[in-house]
Amino acid sequence: MKKEEYLEKVALANLWMRAYYEKDEPLASDEEYDVLIRELRVFEEQNKDEISKDSPTQKIAPTIQSEFKKIAHLKRMWSMEDVFDESELRAWAKRAKCEKNFFIEPKFDGASLNLLYENGKLVSGATRGDGEVGEDITLNVFEIENIPKNIAYKERIEIRGEVVILKDDFEKINEKRALLNQSLFANPRNAASGSLRQLDTSITKERNLKFYPWGVGENTLNFTKHSEVMQFIRELGFLKDDFIKLCANLDEVLKAYDELLALREKKPMMMDGMVVRIDDLALCEELGYTVKFPKFMAAFKFPALEKTTRLIGVNLQVGRSGVITPVAVLEPVNLDGVVVKSATLHNFDEIARLDVKINDFVSVIRSGDVIPKITKVFKDRREGLEMEISRPKLCPTCQSELLDEGTLIKCQNIDCEDRLVNSIIHFVSKKCLNIDGLGENIVELLYKHKKITTLESIFHLKFSDFEGLEGFKEKKINNLLNAIEQARECELFRFITALGIEHIGEVAAKKLSLSFGKEWHKQSFEAYANLEGFGEQMALSLCEFTRVNHVRIDEFYKLLNLKIEKLEIKSDGVIFGKTFVITGTLSRPRDEFKALIEKLGGKVSSSVSKKTDYVLFGEEAGSKLIKAKELEVKCIDESAFNELVKE
């Protein structure tokens, strides 16, 4: 890199840094910024006489501008040096002249917070700011339930940590903001930071923030190891993560990194790496600090789950109900080992809310098996070549005129090929008729060759229909035909679910089956609306569907031997009338536990509240278990549950 290019990159890095910290409007993804900073460091290490005093590597990030008063930290809050692979970790350890006894813990992706306690009482809370001075957010800190307001330690002490929003809570916040037509938070970190800096403290309170301590500032503690300090802090009443380790050497650190990385998707909060710190406090003191970082600790970063790429087009998908879903076509980008070429845009209201255009630079996030989504549009990087994404007028599949209902745009042609194919795929899926071997690709193949054209035609398939089709031999054909025959013996609620009625899922289908049996499709609006858990929207949807399809449903009855599950509820057991929430991985499918609880007169809910009686948890239970403990809900594992049902 030449000096001119270096100075250009310094200017770009400063532009991105100011946009992030001062305007709260990022112009690049974290990964792009990290790469740029690393390029600057490489040049500066090789050209020490040409380092610019304006380089972001030479200064702490600026404080976010706000209406909050400033508050000085008693001791500086430092950033951490980032390392990205084994060689960089070993290089850091070599510089620190230490290769043994490391304290490691998750690096949560949230907002740093400094708490000051005097005489055992919480007196202030402040953001990191520039490291020396932060923003006084004390009133908001008092609204965070898991931060102790009083501790059993009378000396003055600063306790530092990370404020996070759990993934489940983040999704709920964005769902609520979408309903209010407010801009969505790009990620849980931005949501946590924004929640801390609210002028209305009630907003902070409702966001359900969590505080995890990671260190201390000013203190008079007399410990020799950082691990002892953290054990003491957590005994004062602070949250402790379950992945905290002492590693004897760097090989153990690398093993711990792999273990934590494997837990990344299962953790209830976002992590972007692992903190590696020398445990010996005397050695830490001896090593000291650079202009920006402590020499005794580093952030061992995870591969990015969020990257910047360009949106180069939009494809339209037609669902089984006719809803048109826009899908962004992206320049391919590698996210944690997966090449991502597309991302959901949800609907055209979301496109308008994002103000995204073709040829825009966008930030894309991928989490586990969740469909990649666009979280940010970098509008300040537009080059004048961007094109509006217009609302479609015609169905991309059948070219019929679309019905524009605002948020949803629908194809009303019931013979539309994509609608039919997706309806059949849903009809035969695991939670519906569960026809083994009749997957998405085979449905598309059979439809293409006109072997199936309606839901009913599945049950008229013959051996000869498969002969000559690629991949079908005698055994496979017979297995599939046998699976179709077995599907004729089907529970009524599965058949109702399979029909794909708008707003009617598995739970509602069970209620219809148990309440009305095979006459479920001949009821009045009032009868539907009066069912527990049903409302006007569901009743209207049922009335409209059954009005059009009641004859067709009767014809299905001739093809299928539908069974009606009769729920015999035991009303004298300890589970009767109790509400359960199930979380984590158990020895058997959750549906089996759910069925048993309902048979014994209990109810299974999807979320934890003060009305929850029991949380049944398995391995790798997440945010629901944390919330249950905070609400003091009784938490039982599988063996305790088995004992309970015996009573």
Swiss-Prot record:
Keyword Oxidoreductase belongs to the record: no
Enzyme class: ligase
Binding site for Zn(2+): C395, C398, C411, C416
CDD domains recorded: BRCT_DNA_ligase_like (cd17748), LIGANc (cd00114)
Needed cofactors: Mg(2+); Mn(2+)
Active-site annotation: K107
Entry GO MF terms: DNA ligase (NAD+) activity; metal ion binding
A GO cellular-component term linked to this record: cytosol
The name this protein goes by in its record: DNA ligase
Organism: Campylobacter jejuni subsp. jejuni serotype O:23/36 (strain 81-176)
